[in-house]
Amino acid sequence: MQTRYMERTNSMREKRKLEEDDNQQQQQQPERKRPALASVIVEALKMDSLQRLCSSLEPILRRVVSEEVERALAKLGPARLSERSSPKRIEGIGGRNLQLQFRSRLSVPLFTGGKIEGEQGAAIHVVLLDMTTGHVLTVGPEASAKLDVVVLDGDFNTEDDDGWSGEEFEGHLVKERQGKRPLLTGDVQVTLKEGVGTLGELIFTDNSSWIRCRKFRLGLRVSSGYCEGMRVREAKTEAFTVKDHRGELYKKHYPPALDDEVWRLEKIGKDGAFHKKLNKAGIYNVKEFLRLMVKDSQKLRTILGSGMSNRMWETLAEHSKTCVLSEMLYVYYPEDSVGVVFNNIYEFSGLISGKQYYPADSLSDNQKGYVDGLVRKAYENWEQVIEYDSKSLMNFNQVSKTDDIDYSMPVSVPSQPSTSYSDVTVEAYNQSPASSFPGQSQLADTTYMHFGNSSFAPQDQLVNNTHESQSMINSNGGVRLALGPATGSQNQEQLVHPPPEINSYNDWSNTCNRGVDGFLSEEEIRARSNEMLENDDMQQLLRLFSMNGGDQQTPLNMGEDSFGFHSFGQTSMADYEEDRSNSGKAVVGWLKIKAAMRWGFFIRRKAAQRRAQIVQLDEDDE
C-alpha cells in the first residue's frame, strides 16, 4: 500500500516538473506576431491584381498559341495552307476589285418583331467600293445592281482583309427552323443607285438562341442576274444577338439617358438584388447613380455589396459613363476670385480664376493637388454650389495649358479718389437739366480692385469701353452682362484716372445729336426696369449678387447711393461717334442696372433678416 502511494507521488512530481519545463519553454519563445490589417489588405490587393493580370493575359496567350500553330502547319503543308488562305477573287472588268460594304453599325441588341435600325435610329447604308481606288463606284452596270439581304452565322469570323470565297459565304447562311416563318422578313432586296443603297424595313421572326454561337450577322450579296462574269465580294456586319420580344421591356439603353431608371444599366436587373439595394439607398435613375459614383465610388460599391464583382463593376461603370450629359454646370466659389466648375454629374471639369477658365486637363500636377482640396470642400458644402446653364459661362476666356494660376495681377492705381456711382447729375441730350440719373463722372483707363493685401483686376471687366457698353444693349432693351463672383472688403476703394480729353459723363452725352424728349417719367423707368429684370442675363446677374451670403462685406453690403461700380476703359471720342444711334439706349441701360441693384439690395436684406431669425430661434432653443 505504501509502495503504491510512493509511486503515485513520484509520478505526480515528474508530471509537475514536465509542465513547469513546458511553461518555461513557452515563455522563452517569442510570441508570434499577428498580421497587421494593412498587410492583409495589401495581400488581398496583390491577389486581385494577379487575377486581373491572368485574365488579361489569357487572350494574348491564346492568340500567340494560335499563331504558332499556324506557323507549324505552314511548315508541314505550305502548299495546302497557301491554297486554303489565298482569297478566291475574280477581278472585275479592267482589273477592278469590287467589294460591298456596310457603312452603318446596327443598334443592338435586336428583338424579334422589331425593326432593324442603325445606331441611334439612323438608316443603314451600303456602298459598292472599288478597292483599287478606295472610292465608291458610281458608274457602270455594277453601280445599279440589286442586292440580297441574308442572315449569316455569327461564327463567320473571317477578317475583311483576308477575304473569302463565294462558297465560304454561302456555307455560313442561316435558314429558318423547320416549321417556322422565314427568318428575315421585309425588304430583303436593295437596289444600288450610283453605288449607294439603303436598307428598308427588316424584321427578325426568330431569336438567335437556337444556333451554336447564339448570334447572327447580316450579309449582302449580288442578286442572280447581275454582275455576271465578275466577282463582287459580299459584305457582312458584326455579330449580334436577337432576343425574344418579351425581353424588350427589360432592354438596356445604349447609351443610357440621365433620366433612365437605374436598371437600364448593364449588370443591374429590373427588380433584382442590385436594383433593390440602389432604390433603398435613394438611387432611382442613371443621373443619381453617376453623381454618387463621382463623389464617392466606394460608398456606391458598399451599397451594391459583395455580390458585385470587380469585372461586373467595370462593365457597369463603363456603360454608365457613355451617358450623354446635359449642358447644366455647377460652380462652387471657395474664394472671391476662384470658382470650381462641375458638370451635370458633379464631376470636376475646370477652374475659374480671375477672368480665365482652366479646363481640368490643362492643370499641372501641383495645381491638381490644390484643386483636389477645393473639390472635396465643394462636396462637403454642396448646398453653396450655384447651378448655371453652360452657355452663361461662355464669356470666360479659356486657357488650354497653364504653368501657374496667379490670382494677383499687376496693378497701376493712381491716388485720385473715386467718385460715387450715384453722385453725378446727367443732363439730357437737349441740354436741359435732367433728373439725377446714375452715371459715372469720369472714364478710367484702368480699373483695379484692392482687397486686403492683394490686388485683383475685375474679372472680365463689366464693360471694357463705352463702345462695348453700347453694343451690349440688345434690341429688346435688355443688358447683356458678363460678371464674375462678387468681391469685397471693409476698406474697399475704386480709383480712377480720367483721360485728359474727356471731362465727364456730361461731355459724352453732349456729343450725341439724338436726344430724348423731356425727362423719363417714374412709371416709364419702372416699366423698363421690370422688363430688364425679366431678362435671362439679368437674372444671372442677380444670382451672382446673392451667392456670397451675408457674412462678408461686398459691394452689395454698401449703401444704395454709394455703390462703387466698375469704370469704363479709356477710349477716344471717335469710338463714341461710331455708334450714336444706341446712345439713348445706353442711358436707359444704366437706369435698368440701377433698378437691378436696388432690387438686389432688397433681396439681400430679406435674406439677412431670415438668417437673423433662424439664429435667434437657435439661441432660444439652447
Swiss-Prot record:
It comes from the Eukaryota. Residues 10-89 are annotated as: Calmodulin-binding. Residues 1-35 are annotated as: Disordered. Keywords: Activator, Calmodulin-binding, DNA-binding, Nucleus, Transcription, Transcription regulation. Belongs to the plant ACBP60 protein family. GO terms for cellular component: nucleus. Disulfide bonds: none annotated. One of its GO terms (molecular function) is DNA binding. The gene is CBP60C. Expressed in stems, flowers and root. It is found in: Nucleus. Coiled coil: none annotated. The keyword DNA-binding applies. Residues 1-19 have a biased composition (Basic and acidic residues). This is Calmodulin-binding protein 60 C. Transcription activator that binds DNA in a sequence-specific manner, likely 5'-GAAATTTTGG-3', to promote the expression of target genes. Residues 159-282 are annotated as: DNA-binding. Interacts with calmodulin (CaM). Signal peptide: none annotated.
